[in-house]
């Protein structure tokens, strides 16, 4: 689908299975946690501290049991009591304990103590590190509520600046002992990756799930910063999390830094638009501007507590060969980030899964902007045959939430009629449901659109750019054309200037 209708392309073959599957090399051999811990312990140049809060009390145990821990561990501590934890690291806003700021304060405090208490004169060859985590476990009453932060601050050589690798995890198994064991193993994997394989960020990511089940632990955010990772684009790390099956959705902000959904979306009004954005066109901007102006007028929407998301599905990132082109992804991300937008990469082909994802973090009003042709597909029963409750189950998820869909009109060509919710074809069997949603204003037309941009299709713009033909500049926002030209995005090649005649 194209233009205003391109933002929800999905087919029955693209349906996402409920069972999480990780994409790993079957030929790759992995070390056990004990082998990794012993390998670190036997390296006399590695020396550091461990600090663990909450469920995550198991990582350091692997190092003590592996043998040779006295060569590696300067200190291990567990700040289990909340008052003790606050006394050591300081209270967080909202008195939270399992959050990114708490983990960063732990890393800063513990690494600071290393520099304060260990003389570099006495340890001239030591590469110092600090491992920290803060974890809240799941329970049988709330089986998917567990989550936490795990991080490492480390040197790659003595006297070098430090590097940070931070991940966020969600826990899905209600068995607390299994959660503890899995977090312990993942902690060993992360520390081993940072200390041994820091030159290979891809291996750090791959090794996270060595001897850990995706059914128990989901990694939904990773961030690598520091001189050892100057060549790493954290947006590509986000993409890899979804591509590998580690998680189904990731966020990154206008600055290109990865975001954790529970921090970015918590209790917020959310307005999302799905598209390929290849590139961003005038029709995309018309959709978001007019949809936004309607959304902020809603009584239950707080303009100061609103998060706008530009969503790209993994399916929309695939090339004609079925692979994800990372350069093409970065081209799209660069434009969206330059426009000050937060980007969501997801594996949710169906809208009800996207709304269910948002509902983990907020009960406030949500809005989705879509082209009317996409709404036609939303009302196609074939996309819901895998559900026990069929289409009604999916719509129950969609519309039992506080959701409103803003429908942008479509016109296949400049000579054809404009299609809106009033003229959209609906199967007679589904017409009562459709009329109910229209009557209750859960489906609303965007009426203040620009009819002069309805003919713009992203694929048409992309074809013009790649063919080196003129005219595409008029189909994209003013700033975007210069960015495409200046950065040679989407395969743009400047037209050679004509040679001067002799």
Which residues fall in each region the model found?
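Nucleotidyltransferase catalytic core that binds NTPs
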Residues: 2-3, 10, 14-502
């Amino acid at each position: 689908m194209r233009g205003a209708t391109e933002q929800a392309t999905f087919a029955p073959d693209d349906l996402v299975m409920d069972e999480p599957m990780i994409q790993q090399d079957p030929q790759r051999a992995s070390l056990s946690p004990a082998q990794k811990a012993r390998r670190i312990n036997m390296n006399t140049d590695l020396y550091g501290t461990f600090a663990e809060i909450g469920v995550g009390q198991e990582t350091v145990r692997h190092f003590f049991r592996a043998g040779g821990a006295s060569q590696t561990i300067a200190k291990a501590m567990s700040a289990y009591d909340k008052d003790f934890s606050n006394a050591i690291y300081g209270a967080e806003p909202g008195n939270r304990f399992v959050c990114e700021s708490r983990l960063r304060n732990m890393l800063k405090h513990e690494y600071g103590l290393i520099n304060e208490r260990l003389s570099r004169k006495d340890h001239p060859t030591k590469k110092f590190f600090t491992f920290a985590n803060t974890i809240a476990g799941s329970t049988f009453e709330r089986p998917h509520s567990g989550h936490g932060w795990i991080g490492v601050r480390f040197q790659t050589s003595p006297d070098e600046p430090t590097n940070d690798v931070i991940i966020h995890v969600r826990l899905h198994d209600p068995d607390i002992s299994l959660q503890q064991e899995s977090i312990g193993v993942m902690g060993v994997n992360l520390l081993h990756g940072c200390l041994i394989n820091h030159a290979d960020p891809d291996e750090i990511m791959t090794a996270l799930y060595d001897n850990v089940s995706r059914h128990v632990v989901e990694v939904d955010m990773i961030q690598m910063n520091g001189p050892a990772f100057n060549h790493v684009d954290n947006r590509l790390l986000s993409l890899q999390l979804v591509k590998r099956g580690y998680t189904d959705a990731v966020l990154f902000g206008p600055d290109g830094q990865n975001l954790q959904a529970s921090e970015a979306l918590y209790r917020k009004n959310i307005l999302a638009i799905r598209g390929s954005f290849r590139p961003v066109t005038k029709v995309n901007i018309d959709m978001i501007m007019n949809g936004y102006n309607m959304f902020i007028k809603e009584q239950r929407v707080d303009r100061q507590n609103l998060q706008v998301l530009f969503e790209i599905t993994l399916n929309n990132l695939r090339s004609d060969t079925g692979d994800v082109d990372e350069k093409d992804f970065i081209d799209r991300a660069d434009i969206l980030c330059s426009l000050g937008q937060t980007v969501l990469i997801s594996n949710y082909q169906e809208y009800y899964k996207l709304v269910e994802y948002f509902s983990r973090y907020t009960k406030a009003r949500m809005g989705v902007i879509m082209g009317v042709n996409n709404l036609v597909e939303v009302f196609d029963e074939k996309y819901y045959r895998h559900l026990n409750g069929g289409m009604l189950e999916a719509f129950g998820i969609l519309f039992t939430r506080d959701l409103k869909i803003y429908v942008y009109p479509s016109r296949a060509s400049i000579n054809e009629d404009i299609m809106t919710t009033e003229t959209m074809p609906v199967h007679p069997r589904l017409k009562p449901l459709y009329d109910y949603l229209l009557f209750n204003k859960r489906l609303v037309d965007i009426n203040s659109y620009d009819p002069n941009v309805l003919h713009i299709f992203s694929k048409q713009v992309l074809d013009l750019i790649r063919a080196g033909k003129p005219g595409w500049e008029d189909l994209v926002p003013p700033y975007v054309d210069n960015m495409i030209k200046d950065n040679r995005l989407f395969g743009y090649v400047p037209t050679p200037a004509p040679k001067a005649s002799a």
